Amino acid sequence: MTAHVAPISLDFEEGIDRKTLRRLRDRFLLVNQQRWNRAHSALSYRQQMVLEILPLVFHLNHPALPGYLDSDCPYGLSNYQPSPATINAARRLARTFSLKDEGKRKPDLDAMFLMGSPGTLGHSVASDLDVWLCHRSDLPERGIRCLERKAEKLARWAESFGVELHVFVFCASDWRAGRQRVEVTGENCGSAQHFLLLDEFYRTSIHLAGAWPMWWLIPAEREETYDDCMRKLVDYRFVRAEDYIDFGPVPAIPEEEFLGAGVWQLYKGIDAPWKSILKLLLIECYARTTGEALLSSQFKRAVFCGETDADRLDPYVMLYNRLEGWLTGPEVASRLDLIRRSLYLKAGLPLTRSEVSGEQWRARLLRQLVTGWGWSENTLAELDDRQRWRAEDVTTLRRTIVNELTHGYRLLSKMARDHGQRAAISANDINLLGRKLYAAFQRKAGKIEQINPGLAPSLAEENLAFHHQSEQGGDADGWLLYRDLEDPADAFWQPVIRRSGNLAELMVWCYCNGLLTRSTRLNVRSGTSIASVSELREMLDALSAFLPFPIAPAEREALSRGVRPLRNLLLVNVGIDPQAHLTEKGLHKLSSRHDSLGFSGGRENLVISIDQITFNSWHEVSLQHYAAGDTLIQCLKNVLASVAANPDELPAVQVHCHNRGHGSAIARRVQELFADVLRPFFAGGTGPHPLRYVIEMDRRYFLLQFNGLEPGFVALDSFEALMEHLALPQERYLPVVFDRYALQDEPALRAVCLASEPDNIQVFYRILGDQARLWVVDELGSVFSWEQAVTSRRHLLVPVLRFLDNLIERRLLRHTDSAGVVAGVQCYEIVRRDGAWRAEYRPESDSGVPLPGFEVQAVGIHEGDSRLRFDIFCGDQEFSVQEYGDQLIPAVAHYIRSLRHSDEVYPVYLTDIHLPHDLDPRVYQQDIQTSQYLYYRSVLEDSLNRHLARTR
């Protein structure tokens, strides 16, 4: 084969001839055939069949061929005649296949091309096949959809042969007009890069069938007048229009396209860095050397000048030569070295090994390059030995790659801003790509960094040793990770793989990066901790069940939505004995209480620490450690916060606790708690719903509730403090929900809150001998409670019912409609029947016969910044603050006492209270909540009754 032939010159002004054009076309076809042969030879026997038969399955709509859908699917490739090898391949697939004459039927398809790395130095066994299938511009939408479905079916067939095939269906006129119907996926660049992709197509494509590129016939120096030249060729019939397909010229890359293209290559670089680094640097080179010829133009000029040597025209060789010529000087030596390593690893051809059958030309070409680079055999051996790369090697290389990718993105982004250009990428695409970049590269607190984005085949270690720093003397805390450390004494001289203050974080990092597998031998030197090999083995099992390795990249659909948690794994008490202080005393359980949050007679909370591992929809893994303060409540609060934005899909919560010290019981209790809390807050796939959730733990009470989308909690040290808090006013109806183990000593209160209803005032009572406990749940769910002596049910209820009736009546008078008015007062008795506590409805017991006595009313007044005071009216007798000052309560008590017989001893009850609308000086309250009236009623009654008792 002649590598260099006579140059061809086309002078559109002086005249051209058809013979020269045919000679030029044949020269491009010669280069094309060499590339096809190279692409074919790089495939296995079964894979070669896919490449051979591709044009035929679209040229014929034959039911025996792969991808067939129905008889209406468009077919037929312009000017295509299958070769004997193609027909034989079809008959190997379907013995009944025979080629039929289609007559003069107009083909539906214009051309088919293979583009990218096949047939080039950059092709490897992992490379996919990207095919452009171009249809007629007048093809109906239904036909286009059918072709797309056929392409998808064909891709599934090719996958069974070990080929990753992607067929993109479009027409050339849509491409020229920028109307391509694509979005960002793993295989095409959406709106990100039009001209850069066309530049790549022209220099890498292999013509498979149909019309030839019109671009071949337009000299490189005439790209600026491409359309005029093309029209002259067609109008003057130098070529037949149906023989050529026109994707348009690439005179230059528009500046506004660089940002989109850069982001796209970063997107690809997350999973396939070597190719993307080369392309990203080419984009930067193009951006910095505007005015210089593009690689596609250099390729075309070389063919016009007589160059047909496939080695010298290899797209990756040309790309490298362009970058090498651009990166000159010692200050860019490290970047040039990264380019060389990227090209070598992209080729995927280990030169230090002899198994290169079928790859002789690639091995020869690659060897020429590395010889010119001056690489030593040690450098080659290091790159060829990727199977033995360790975490430290990958971490260093990843840092270099991330720095280069980040540098490229920032530079291109700045250039786009400086030129004031609008990036040639849609807002949706750039948002999507940015999210993937963020998920892969962004560092943030707690995120587990994944260090091996396709750099090494595996980082699995045979032996890993976890050493607590206290093993090395002193009081240092934290953990060190070693490999192959049989003798602990060698730790001082062995390199540390990783340091962490947290054993769980170290384990998760090892697992997510593939260092730790089920076959890895473990060694633990726990020091002051009590961690063990068995605990780490159990933790590994929990991690494997929670998150299969390797972690797949997030799907496009997930990245198009906001990030949300998919599932959580809670590791409880890692390396901790929660009963250590009891064990030292020889005590394990001092009562029948088996709640892990209030264990034994001491009500001990056995949850000391939690490591919360979260896997989210962008496939990020994060770990948050809780070991100080209210560990469990803090973790619960953060889980609630993460769910609030997406309540329709609750994340799964798994809990693991080592079997030491009631581990399974602790895990079960924590899992129950999280399920119990999430359920009412997000019932029905909506929320967060307004409610207050009460948890009893470690001799304290915790009340959880949301403020908007933000959860918060209040810790209360006693039952009395809890009741005071439940009585506080609310902005809206907030029912009280108790955890299944909370307040088991107060079953009546649980029954009261369970029976609570909105827009009602409910009075509950329980009589125990001569004492009664009353609870009032008001219209917004506040719970006010008190105890009092009881002589009869009527004497117990009538005072409070009349007080509430007066309050409701006054509200009715203030409102012109029913909005904001409670339905009324309902009475319930708390009883225990069949071992269960329940609230049973009791009609109001006021018989209509008035109780003896007179009305006692209080009217609250605010004077300036002074505290709230009350004027009190006993029947028609007024006692004002102005007149009595601090002696008002004693004066009222003395007056009431004077009206009673000397032997009468019973409490006084207020029948009504008026509160000012500026009770809270910060706001004007149109309707003051019932619980606030009850609070001031209780304060005044207690004060009056104390003074009554003193006057006896």
Map each language-model feature to its residues:
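Arginine/glycine-rich "motif VI" loop of SF2 helicases in the C-terminal RecA-like domain
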Residues: R156-G162
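Basic- and aromatic-enriched surface patches that contact anionic nucleotides/nucleic acids
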Residues: E152-K153, S173
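Catalytic metal-binding acidic patch
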Residues: F113, T120-L147, E164-V169
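Extended helix-rich, non-globular scaffold segments
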Residues: S127-H135, E141-G143, F161, V182-N188, ...
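Amphipathic alpha-helical scaffolding segments
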Residues: L129-H135, L139, C146-E152, R340-R341, ...
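Short, conserved secondary-structure transition motifs
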Residues: V163-T185
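Well-ordered mid-protein domain cores that form the structural environment of catalytic cofactors
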Residues: G67-A126
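Nucleotidyltransferase catalytic cores
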Residues: M1-R91, G178-V182, N188, F195, ...
